[in-house]
Amino acid sequence: MPHRDQPKTAHVTTRRLLDMKQQGEKISMLTAYDYTMARILDRAGVDVLLVGDSASNVFSGHSTTLPITIEEMIYHAKAVVRGVHDETGRAMVVIDMPFMSYQLSSEEALRNAGKIMKEHECDAVKMEGGHVIVESVKRITDVGIPVMGHLGLMPQSIYKYGSYRVRAQEEQEAEQLLRDAELLEKAGAFAIVLEKIPSALAAQVTASLTIPTIGIGAGVACDGQVLVINDILGLNREFHPRFVRQYVDLNSMIEQVARQYVTDVRGCDFPSSNESY
C-alpha cells in the first residue's frame, strides 16, 4: 500500500537543477514508465524521472520511438507521477513530447504541451531538436511550462539519420550543435540532454551553458547522466550499447523465477498448506 503518511522530502525543481550545476553536484536521471518502478526510483534518490518515448520500444515492442501517441505518453506519465507522490515526492518528473506532437507548428506544440501538463502533475516536457524548434520552446516556456531540450542523436529523427551512430563528429555538425544548445538556452530551456556525441564536444557545450546538460553516451563532463531503466537492469538481452552500464541481469533472473514457478505448479508444490486458506 502507498506510504502516504511518510515524511516527504524537498521536491526537485528546475531551480534545484541549476543550483546542482553551479555547485558541481551531478544530476541522476532514469526513465520510468509505471507506478511501481517510479516508487522504487524515487525512494532510491534518483533526481529526475523521464517518462520517455522509449516506452514505444521497451513497453510496446516497436523498433523506434515514433509510433507512441500523446495519449499513451500521458497514460504512462500519470502512473509515474502517482508513484512519486506515494513515495518521497522528491523526484522531478519530465515527459517526452512524442513524435509529431510539436513539429507541425509552435501553436500545435503549445497546445499539446498544455494538454500534457493539465492531465497530470508532471514538472516539465522534453523536446528533441535545435534551431527548428526554438520558436516552439520559447512559446511554451513563455506560458510557464518548463522545457528540457535534446540534442545530438535524436531518436525521433532516426529515419533521417539512417543509423544510431555517434553524432556531431564532423566539425560542421558539431558547430551547429553548439549553436543549437545556446539557442535553446536563450529560448528558455532549463536543461539539455546530449545523446551520443563526442565527450570533448559535450564538455564544450556544458562549459558554454549556464543550464545543466544531461548526457547519455556523451561522457563524464556533462552535469548529469540519464539511462533507460530497462537497460541498466539487463531486461533486454539483445541490446548492449557501449554507453550502458548493466548493473544486473534481470532478464535471466526473471526467466529463472518463472521456470521455477512453472515447475512448482506442475509438480503440485505450489501452493503449499501455508499458502492456502
Swiss-Prot record:
It comes from the Bacteria. The active site is at E195 (proton acceptor). Belongs to the PanB family. Binds 1 Mg(2+) ion per subunit. One of its GO terms (biological process) is pantothenate biosynthetic process. It is found in: Cytoplasm. Its cofactor is Mg(2+). This is 3-methyl-2-oxobutanoate hydroxymethyltransferase. One of its GO terms (molecular function) is 3-methyl-2-oxobutanoate hydroxymethyltransferase activity. GO terms for cellular component: cytoplasm. Transmembrane segments: none annotated. SUPFAM superfamilies: Phosphoenolpyruvate/pyruvate domain. Homodecamer; pentamer of dimers. Its EC number is 2.1.2.11. It catalyses: 3-methyl-2-oxobutanoate + (6R)-5,10-methylene-5,6,7,8-tetrahydrofolate + H2O = 2-dehydropantoate + (6S)-5,6,7,8-tetrahydrofolate. Catalyzes the reversible reaction in which hydroxymethyl group from 5,10-methylenetetrahydrofolate is transferred onto alpha-ketoisovalerate to form ketopantoate.
